[in-house]
Amino acid sequence: MTSSYVGRFAPTPSGYLHFGSLVAAVASYLDARAVGGRWLVRMEDLDPPREVPGAQQAILETLERYGFEWDGAVERQSERFPAYAAVVEQLLRSGLAYACTCSRKQLEGFAGIYPGFCRDAGHAREDAAIRLRVPELEYRFVDRVQGEVRQHLGREVGDFVIQRRDGLYAYQLAVVLDDAWQGITDIVRGADLLDSTPRQLYLQELLGLSQPRYLHVPLIVQPDGHKLGKSYRSPPLPAEQAAAPLTRALRALGQRPPAELAQASASEALAWGVAHWDATRIPRCATLPEERL
């Protein structure tokens, strides 16, 4: 069975894969393979100062040990900077973006919503971030798991950064351009990115790009409520006995694997997941406590 489905897993090499990463990888992989779709791997290495040496290779080796097989070459965002630069220039020329010299201190007290201080200031680009003007509109989309999501860009976000003051490109810009460039039809990722999606929809609309389908899976969190991640020193995935974490990830996604699957090989665990995948079973919540899994 083949289909037009193209999915992707896009880790950030600021550390090694942990259980939360595995849940996202399993969800995106099974959602693609269950319908005969393609599954790509992309390194979101936008921020070199935060990248851990050797993490990219370690991530790929972990995916292989856990039975994942991706299609095509691994793409890297660090190789796409000229494409991002061209779009930033296009948006500046059209008046849809502008230079912003605001410091973090100036923006304290605005709850992350940009107040528009530089919107009509006409600053030069030197030593400035680039922000995208947003409309006073509510954006709406229906997530395959989380349901209807609404966000008023003007009131809840404000003009947002597409290129940082240090010249590095923002995630919101890069992810939209790369998903379009790679022909991604379905984005399956963690619910921590649900709030970013309306900004991405707006960019897709501005640039005349097609809108993929979205599925945001619950985020695995620690007892203190923080998500599993490199910032909180979450343990990396074990190198051996991959089927046990894979089976646990299947349970986190609402699937019903037999207990004995934890003793199988990694490829057998993923094959079971592909054969029995049912996205409607994924819990409709933003977070899942790790200790309950």
From Swiss-Prot:
What family is this protein classified in?
Answer: Belongs to the class-I aminoacyl-tRNA synthetase family. GluQ subfamily.
What Enzyme Commission number(s) appear in the record?
6.1.1.-
Q: Which UniProt keywords apply?
A: Aminoacyl-tRNA synthetase, ATP-binding, Ligase, Metal-binding, Nucleotide-binding, Zinc
Gene symbol of the encoding locus? gluQ
Top-level taxon: Bacteria
Any GO BP:
glutamyl-tRNA aminoacylation
Note accompanying the cofactor annotation: Binds 1 zinc ion per subunit.
Quote the record's binding site residues for ATP: 230
Q: Which Pfam families has this protein been placed in?
A: tRNA-synt_1c
Annotated motif 'HIGH' region: location in the chain?
A: 11-21
Q: Which residues bind L-glutamate?
A: 8-12, 44, 171, 189
Protein name (record): Glutamyl-Q tRNA(Asp) synthetase
Q: Which cofactor does it need?
A: Zn(2+)
Indicate yes or no for the key word Cytoplasm: no
GO molecular function term, any single one? zinc ion binding
What does this gene product do? Catalyzes the tRNA-independent activation of glutamate in presence of ATP and the subsequent transfer of glutamate onto a tRNA(Asp). Glutamate is transferred on the 2-amino-5-(4,5-dihydroxy-2-cyclopenten-1-yl) moiety of the queuosine in the wobble position of the QUC anticodon.
Q: What's any one GO cellular component for it?
A: cytosol
Enzyme group, top EC level? Answer: ligase
What PANTHER family does the annotation carry?
GLUTAMATE--TRNA LIGASE (PTHR43311), GLUTAMYL-Q TRNA(ASP) SYNTHETASE (PTHR43311:SF1)
Identify the InterPro entries for this entry: Glu-Q_tRNA(Asp)_Synthase, Glu/Gln-tRNA-synth, Glu/Gln-tRNA-synth_Ib_cat-dom, GluQ/Sye, Rossmann-like_a/b/a_fold
Q: Where does Zn(2+) bind?
A: 100, 102, 114, 118
Extent of motif 'KMSKS' region: 227-231
